């Protein structure tokens, strides 16, 4: 049931928000598959749904904690995003904490939290190389088409 619901959500997001197949991928772990969505795709969805948010940094050091309060229509949710040297290999821990908090709120407002995860959730949620190659090729084709259209 959970897998079907997750699959349906991904298909609904692709259709409703005009997202590409390269905005998602399946992470295979422990014999199960989990849908992952790109942070940038979630920001596109938020813009289309007019989701707004405010951020508050609750802790600076050594661990960073950012609180996000997000609103869509008459619904408001909140979530925390954390980042530390133990769960973030990137050199931008504040940005990662912010992305995690915002993405969790967006997914909650879309009733997709716990069914689809953001790529910002964990370093091991990163996009597979094969998907990145497809995405790069897709972007190059779009640029070629734009150049032909714009002269």
What are the roles of these predicted feature ranges?
Residues 1-151:
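Polyanion-binding surfaces on beta-sheet-dominated domains and ring/shell assemblies
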């Amino acid at each position: 049931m959970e897998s079907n619901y997750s699959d349906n959500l991904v298909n609904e997001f692709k259709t409703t928000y005009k997202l590409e197949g390269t905005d998602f991928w399946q992470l295979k772990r422990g014999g199960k598959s989990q849908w992952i969505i790109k942070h940038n795709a979630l920001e596109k969805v938020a813009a289309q749904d007019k989701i707004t948010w405010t951020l508050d940094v609750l802790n600076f050091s050594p661990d960073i904690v950012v609180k996000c309060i997000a609103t869509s229509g008459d619904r408001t949710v909140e979530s925390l995003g954390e980042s530390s040297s133990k769960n973030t290999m990137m050199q931008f821990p504040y940005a990662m904490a912010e992305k995690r908090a915002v993405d969790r709120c967006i997914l909650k407002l879309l009733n997709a939290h716990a069914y689809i995860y953001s790529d910002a959730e964990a370093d091991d949620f990163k996009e597979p190389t094969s998907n990145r190659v497809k995405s790069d090729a897709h972007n190059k084709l779009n640029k070629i088409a734009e150049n032909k259209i714009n002269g």
